[in-house]
Regions:
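Alpha/beta-hydrolase active-site loop signature
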Residues: 37, 68-72, 137, 230
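Short, surface-exposed "cap/lid" segments of acyl-processing enzymes
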Residues: 23-55
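Primarily recognizes the serine-hydrolase "nucleophile elbow" in alpha/beta-hydrolase
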Residues: 89-151
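Catalytic nucleophile-loop/oxyanion-hole region of alpha/beta-hydrolase
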Residues: 44-48, 69-102
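N-terminal cap/lid segment of alpha/beta-hydrolase-fold proteins
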Residues: 1-25
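Conserved alpha/beta-hydrolase
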Residues: 51-73
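The alpha/beta-hydrolase serine catalytic core
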Residues: 15, 124-212, 217-225, 229-230, ...
């Protein structure tokens, strides 16, 4: 396995990512999409998305991790519509890579990253399959102005929103969540497969979101509710074991 630092350009912003490359290429690709930044989640034993990426690269997937705008070492301010453009920029880069099997590009998204993955896959046929973990089907930020202002203030203190004059329009920033966090996109993935995973103890996104999304999705589709798991499914061994097994079955079946 090799690791390479890579930068993507989106709306003039520089986004930082990493490629985890198996020995044998060209090969299928998995792009990991993180969720909205949150406070107080540091865990010295958590190897983060890099640790998760190694799990998939060892199974033969060229695995891509990156930070959406406003997050980690990437430039810009947090904006959910902007995240969809960021993912498109990453996919554009992947599609040009000689080490990638362009016919097998999968997304594994978590929470907001799952919503962005579904939205993007609904409009981008280059994506062959999606795994959506702890995915919301609606957002309180789309309707609650006071909550949106609180989140923006928190993100400003965290450095996720860096510019004092951002967002230029609070209403448009909120409307982005109404557009992206929606069950109206998921049926457009068919006949490409989707796997929905949710924890039954998720206190951030209700498990009812998973069932609603599953109901709206076209075939082929699968759903898994992990007993005892909370919102952070990335650190659930059971959830990620099932995600890897499902992805392998969908990717290497032929």
């Amino acid at each position: 396995m090799k690791r390479e630092i890579v930068y993507f350009k989106s709306d003039g912003l520089k986004l930082k990512g990493q490629l985890f490359i198996p020995e044998k290429t060209p090969c299928p690709v998995l792009c990991l999409c993180h969720g909205m930044p949150r406070k107080g989640l540091a865990n010295p034993n958590d190897r983060g998305y890099a640790g998760l990426a190694e799990r998939f690269v060892n199974a033969g997937f060229l695995t891509v991790t990156f930070n959406f705008r406003g997050s980690g070492a990437s430039e810009g301010n947090f904006d959910i519509r902007g995240w969809t453009r960021d993912l498109k920029a990453v996919l554009d880069h992947i599609y040009k890579m000689k080490r990638a099997d362009q016919g097998k590009i999968a997304l594994l998204g978590f929470s907001a990253g799952a919503a962005v993955s579904i939205y993007t896959a609904a409009q981008d046929r280059r994506i062959s399959s999606v795994i959506a973990c702890a995915c919301p089907d609606t957002s309180r930020l789309a309707k609650n102005r006071e909550l949106a202002q609180t989140v923006i203030a928190d993100y400003r203190s965290m450095g996720v929103i860096k510019d004092d004059n951002f967002p230029p329009s609070l209403q448009e920033w909120m409307q982005g969540f109404d557009e992206i966090y929606s069950d109206k996109w998921i049926d457009k993935l068919a006949p490409r497969p989707i796997f929905i995973i949710h924890g039954d103890q998720d206190d951030v996104v209700s498990p009812t979101s998973a069932f609603n999304l599953y109901k709206r999705a076209g075939d082929p589709k699968e759903i898994l509710v992990v007993k005892g798991a909370g919102h952070r499914l990335r650190i659930s061994e059971q959830a990620m074991d099932h995600a890897l097994a499902w992805l392998k079955s969908r990717t290497f079946r032929d």
